[in-house]
């Protein structure tokens, strides 16, 4: 029989009884069954058409794999008020590791931001000479500095916490939702899809996603923070 997509065969976390899979040590098999359009046992192991980021044949503990596959978050800060921008930089300091990138987009505060950021290798500043840009235009300016993963876009009074990063990680990795955009502030975007659709060039990223979903007849990848709260319950 041809393979549906992914298989739990030989996965470290596959739980079997009498040579047939019954569960998953990570507790996500029920989610796989619910979210997959195809999910069935083939030769003793579940096969399905969703992507499980945790599948491995290496000897790892549950805690190790959950930490290893935790979503990589980057940050874009749109600077239109230097005091508020500096406050945002302070507020995310504990959330930023060497694997995260932080990019600040500004039109007039390059010097003050440079003094604040110093020589941190994963912090970047983009300086634009065009006034009255939209937040979306600032996003496009900065994305060449951002690596794959997901990006949180922060502007003026926006706030983000470890709790909400955990919720997004749960929503994607554990609940297996296909997330391309959280549309209410602070915005969260899937970096690969954002770059593939060329951001907001010619048409907003949200509208491009709508067209893509309609063309491919797939479920919406656009969510709100309320959706995240409801589905994760964290």
For the regions a language model picked out, list residue spans one by one.
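Short, acidic, metal-binding catalytic loop of nucleotide-sugar glycosyltransferases
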Residues: 90-99
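The conserved acidic donor/metal-binding loop of glycosyltransferases
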Residues: 155-159
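Cysteine-centered metal-binding/redox modules
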Residues: 1-66
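Conserved donor-nucleotide/metal-binding helix-loop-beta segment in metal-dependent transferases, i.e.
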Residues: 165-180
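N-proximal low-complexity "stem/linker" segments adjacent to membrane-targeting elements
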Residues: 56-91
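Short aromatic/hydrophobic "clamp" motif used to bind/position activated sugar donors
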Residues: 151
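Short beta-strand/loop segment that forms part of the nucleotide-sugar
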Residues: 99-109, 127-128
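Glycine-rich, basic loop-to-helix element that forms the pyrophosphate-binding segment
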Residues: 129-146
């Amino acid at each position: 029989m041809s393979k549906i997509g992914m298989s739990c065969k030989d996965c470290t976390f596959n739980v079997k009884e009498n040579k047939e899979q019954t569960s998953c040590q990570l507790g996500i098999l029920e989610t796989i069954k619910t979210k997959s359009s195809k999910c069935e046992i083939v030769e003793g192991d579940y096969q399905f058409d969703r992507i499980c980021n945790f599948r491995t044949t290496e000897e790892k503990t549950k805690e190790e794999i959950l930490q290893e596959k935790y979503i990589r978050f980057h940050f874009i800060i749109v600077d239109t008020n230097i005091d508020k921008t500096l406050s945002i930089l302070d507020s995310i300091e504990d959330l930023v590791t060497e694997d995260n990138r932080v990019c600040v987009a500004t039109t007039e505060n390059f010097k003050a931001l440079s003094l604040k950021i110093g020589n941190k290798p994963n912090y970047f500043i983009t300086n634009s000479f065009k006034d009255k840009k939209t937040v979306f235009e600032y996003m496009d300016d900065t994305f060449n500095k951002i690596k794959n993963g997901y990006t949180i876009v922060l502007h003026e009074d926006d706030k983000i916490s470890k709790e909400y990063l955990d919720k997004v990680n749960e929503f994607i990795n554990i609940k297996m939702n296909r997330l391309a955009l959280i549309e209410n502030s602070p915005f969260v975007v899937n970096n690969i899809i954002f770059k593939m659709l060329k951001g907001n060039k010619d048409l907003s990223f949200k509208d491009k996603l709508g067209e893509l979903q309609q063309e491919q007849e797939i479920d919406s990848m656009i969510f709100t923070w309320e959706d995240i709260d409801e589905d994760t319950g964290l």
